[in-house]
Design a protein with these regions (language model features):
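Short, acidic, small-residue-rich periplasmic hinge/interaction motif at the N-terminus
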Residues: 4, 15-19, 57-61, 80-123, ...
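Short, polar/charged loop or turn motifs at beta-strand boundaries
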Residues: 114-137, 159-164, 226-231
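Exposed aromatic-hydrophobic patches
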Residues: 36-48, 83-85
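Short, acidic Ser/Thr/Gly-rich low-complexity loop/linker segments typical of extracellular
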Residues: 21-42
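A short, solvent-exposed loop/turn motif at the edges and junctions
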Residues: 21-23, 44-47, 53-72
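Primarily recognizes Gram-negative and organellar outer-membrane beta-barrels
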Residues: 167-170, 190-233, 248-919
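Coil residues (strongly favoring Ser/Thr
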Residues: 3, 20-21, 65, 98, ...
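Periplasmic plug
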Residues: 146-194, 208-213
Length: 919
């Protein structure tokens, strides 16, 4: 490492000398792991057992030569011999040959398993944030903060190799300016403890996206602020500040807005109505993050605190058709709700690195409270009201106006005014330690996870139920539902490496103890049992309770109230056996035995029982993998919870009754997965092929008994067989020309699902088995050339069933369009055009075309372009609808939401950065 900056050096030449300076092995070169984080620099040295005392000589370009004596023990299994860090001094004078620098704008390169994107090669408007850059990266998909690269989910977003806001990508995506970014790397991240465990792992490494800042922003501070106002009362304001040094990072951000939208004009985001955010949201959130570490990287502290407020006004009106054998039923549903939620979250992470051990401690806390005020009205009919989603029929239903259609066709209807409140506190503590055993390759892992959760839910409800025979009942309901949950789980693992000729055998015995305690009560009151509380007109205002405790006890609904206390103690023993055929090719098997004790103390009306259970289940996993492929098989077995096995009846919702089932059996699952990777760095080709097959035995489905007279549905869990699914996907990223400016991305997927379930048959009392076979084929492609991008996607769904009354589906959903960026002097334009189409639907209104056009224009001011003014137009042609239609095997649902797809916004952005003074 550098003696001044403590930065690890690479490449480094290493020679092994005898004490009299005779060269034993020379010109060995260090190597980096595939994740390209500089701290992962190693060199493998193989020596005979006759060498006990040697001298290592280190040579790096631009540095003086360094030496380090090492004593090797005689233990035959010893492979690691630690010594102090070797610090190399920079040479005082360095003579360089003449070089010619040619500027290029290659957008992406591949280095082993790492994809490196050059941020400067992607043209973005001056005010762009990181999310707009990420959307333009070939092979990358961004959906509401979730990032997919070549079909794989990105688990964390890093900043200069370190977790940023605990890996929460949305903070960085929304607040980090794109102009600060130098490179974006995507790779499988080795764990922090790999210097203890080595780089050979049996489990799959997490995929991360590492945002590398430009050198001038690695030390100093930056800040930016933005404000905007638009049509329909849309507004936003946000601020972000970041302070960097080599060993510290401080970030602060704040954001208030009511736009409820994360998409940007000129990007590849989805703009069809199915992706519109539902409702109107007033959101306010902010946070602070602190990172501290020492130069030697022996300790690191990362803390993050975030506060959030949300106010959501949600309105919807739905028209539904329920497909039944002897005749469809028709529903009209209207909801109007306002939800308020506050949340405070904190994450803390401490890493401690010692020569022979690694310790990590994580702490997480969360506090949330909120309330929901909602009115829901619904009606189910035998005939179609044929008045769309105007829902005037609901107004007629709950008024004194008489309707011949309602009298003839109504099955049931209800109006439910509800006020709900929730308070929750959660705490979690995790600790893990990796301890190396002397000079051996063996190590011990000790892990602990502890959780505490305390939840209180309360709700008030005025429920008015109408029956098709003209009957009417009013329920004045109140419930409180406190719950306490405690989990504790220590794990001990020993990792043992044994030489087997030229190969290696890894044995990993593991033992895990898990304790779980869950206490949940529901006190359910029918206030309509009391005089003066039993009619909609006379009942006190929603949210009030009787002041007399005896009245509360008189209103207690014992049938739907309960006390539940569950305790679980489980032991999980496993043995992983990995046979290393080569350094990368591994054959592994992991059998496991799970022994569990369950105890349930449950009291409810006529039930007062203590149920206990001891059982043993088996599991297994097989894996055959190499650097470019992986084949896995897994078997799991799970028991139904004791609560599901109780013979109970819950009719707190008079139209949806739920039963237990003492006859439930264990569920078994078989899972097969195949991954194959093809890469060609020279041609910039990346192909990922995946396949999977899943078989479920004794799966638990919800059996449904339907009463066609009253419309009451009774649900009961039952075991069912015949469920399985299979799928395959191919993701391709390929440069089509020599300078890599023309890049093709293709995502092809085929999925087959054999779904066996219980469905209601109109006119019959019992559910019958139904098998629906569905085939879904999807092809999506994009072609990008500098600042222009073409995109298209087509999805075909075929579903069939032998169930009487089932209509075979053959539906196409597809879109095509283009997006681009244009610089006209000081004016920057970003725009996108996309046509969304549907074909093959029985409902003619679903076979439609929508042209969506969005545009953004901006201009920068001041000498350093610190001030930016932008105007955005969303859905300029006004073809996006806030009506969504969904068709599946169970029915057709058409829903209107109070979203605003079309609007314009003026935004003003100011940014400031200060670099340290050059010495």
């Amino acid at each position: 490492m550098d003696s001044f900056t403590y930065e690890l050096l690479h490449p480094v030449k290493i020679d092994v000398l005898t004490p009299d300076s005779t060269v034993i092995v020379g010109d060995l070169e260090s190597y980096e792991f595939a994740n390209f984080m500089e701290r992962n620099v190693n060199c493998i040295i193989s020596l005979g057992r006759e060498h006990r005392d040697v001298i290592l000589r280190f040579r790096a370009n631009g540095y003086d030569t360094g030496y380090q004596p090492v004593h090797l023990s005689g233990n035959r299994r010893a492979v690691y011999f630690p010594f102090e860090d070797v610090k190399l001094r920079r040479m005082s004078t360095i003579n360089l040959d003449d070089v010619e620098i040619v500027a290029t704008q290659i957008r992406m390169v591949m280095r082993g398993d790492t994809i490196v994107y050059n941020a400067d090669a992607f043209q973005l408007s001056q005010g762009s944030m990181l999310d707009e850059l990420v959307r333009k990266l070939p092979g990358v998909q961004l959906d509401g903060g979730r990032i997919m690269v070549n079909g794989r989910f990105v688990s964390s977003l890093l900043l200069n190799g370190e977790n940023f806001f605990t890996g929460d990508p949305k903070v960085a995506l929304d607040n980090l300016p794109a102009y600060m970014v130098d490179k974006v790397k995507v790779y499988d991240k080795s764990p922090e403890h790999d210097y203890i465990t080595g780089k050979e792992v049996l489990d799959e490494l997490p995929l991360v996206m590492d945002v590398q800042l430009k050198r001038e922003y690695n030390t100093g501070w930056i800040a930016n602020a933005e404000a905007g106002y638009g049509t329909h009362g849309r507004w936003l304001a946000q601020a972000f500040g970041l302070r960097f040094t080599d060993n510290t990072r401080l970030a602060l951000f704040g954001n208030v807005n009511n736009i409820n939208d994360t998409r940007e004009p000129g990007t590849s985001g989805n703009w069809n109505s199915g992706w519109l955010a539902n409702g109107l949201t007033d959101m306010r959130y902010g946070g602070v993050e602190l990172l501290l570490k020492d130069k030697q990287d022996t300790w690191k502290l990362n803390s993050y605190v975030k506060g959030l407020y949300e106010g959501i006004n949600h309105e919807s009106k739905a028209s539904a058709v329920n497909f039944l054998e002897s005749g469809d039923t028709y529903q009209r549903i209207a909801k109007n709700s306002y939800m308020r939620r506050n949340k405070l979250i904190s994450h803390h992470n401490l890493d401690l690195k010692y020569p022979q051990s690694y310790v990590n401690i994580k702490a997480y806390t969360e506090y949330a409270d909120g309330n929901t005020d909602q009115l829901e009205q619904s009606a189910e009919f035998r005939d179609n009201p044929k008045e769309g989603y105007g829902h005037s029929i609901l107004d007629t239903l709950f008024s004194s106006i008489k309707s011949e259609f309602v009298d003839r066709s109504l099955i049931n209807g209800y109006s439910n005014a509800e006020l709900a409140r929730q308070r929750m506190f959660r705490g979690e503590l995790k600790g893990e330690a990796y301890i190396k055993i002397g000079n051996l390759p063996d190590y011990v892992t000790v892990n602990f996870v502890g959780n505490y959760r305390n939840i209180l839910n309360t709700s008030y409800s005025h429920y008015d139920l109408l029956s098709g025979n003209g009957g009417r009942s009013f329920q004045n309901r109140y419930s409180d539902h406190p719950e306490v949950r405690i989990d504790a789980s220590p794990t001990v693992t020993y990792n043992l490496d044994l030489p087997v000729g030229e190969k290696k055998l890894r044995l990993i015995p593991s033992y895990k103890l898990k304790y779980n305690y869950n206490q949940g009560n529901r006190n359910y009151y029918r206030l309509d049992y009391l005089d003066g509380w039993n009619t909609a007109d006379a009942a006190p205002e929603l949210g009030q309770l009787p002041s007399n405790n005896s009245l509360m006890q008189a209103a207690l609904d014992a049938t739907n109230s309960y006390h539940s206390q569950q305790t679980t103690l489980s032991h999980l023993a496993s043995l992983s056996v990995g046979y290393f055929l080569t350094d990368t090719r591994i054959l592994a098997i992991r059998p496991q035995v799970h022994m569990q004790y369950d105890r349930l103390d449950y009291r409810r009306a006529h039930i007062d029982t203590v149920a206990t259970r001891n059982y043993t289940s088996l599991g297994a996993a097989l894996q055959f993998s190499d650097s470019d492929f992986k084949l896995t098989y897994g078997y799991t077995e799970s028991k139904p919870t004791l609560l599901r096995l109780l013979d109970i009846r819950d009719d707190s919702n008079p139209l949806a009754i739920r039963l237990g089932n003492p006859d439930l059996k264990s569920t078994q699952a078989h899972q097969f997965d195949f991954h194959r990777y093809f890469t060609n760095e020279e041609k910039l080709r990346n192909i990922t092929w995946r396949g999977e097959y899943n078989l479920y035995m004794n799966a638990i489905a919800q059996s449904l008994t339907y009463d066609p007279i009253t419309g009451v549905r009774t649900y009961q869990p039952k075991n069912i067989n015949g469920n399985w699914d299979a799928g395959s996907s191919v993701n391709i990223t390929q440069a089509l020309n020599e300078d890599r400016s023309l890049i093709l991305t293709s995502n092809t997927g085929v999925n087959y699902n054999n779904s066996v379930d219980y469905v209601a048959i109109d006119g019959m009392n019992e559910s019958t088995k139904s098998c629906v076979r569905s085939l879904r084929i999807n092809e999506g492609a994009s072609l990008s050339y500098y600042d222009l991008s073409l995109k298209g996607n087509v999805q075909w769904l075929h579903a069939e069933s032998q169930r009487a009354g089932f209509e075979t589906l053959n539906c196409f959903d597809f879109y095509y369009g283009l997006s681009g960026y244009l610089n006209i002097g000081s004016l920057e334009l970003s725009t996108d055009f996309t046509v969304y189409s549907r074909r093959g639907y029985a409902d003619k209104y679903m076979n439609d075309d929508n042209l969506v056009w969005n545009i953004r224009a901006e201009r920068s001011f001041l000498p350093k372009s610190n001030l930016i003014v932008a105007i955005e137009g969303f859905d300029i042609l006004g073809q996006l609808s806030n009506v969504q239609r969904t068709l599946n095997a169970q029915g057709l649902v058409e829903t209107w939401y109070n979203s605003i797809p079309q609007y314009a916004m003026l935004r003003v952005i100011y940014r400031l950065n200060r670099e340290p003074k050059k010495k």
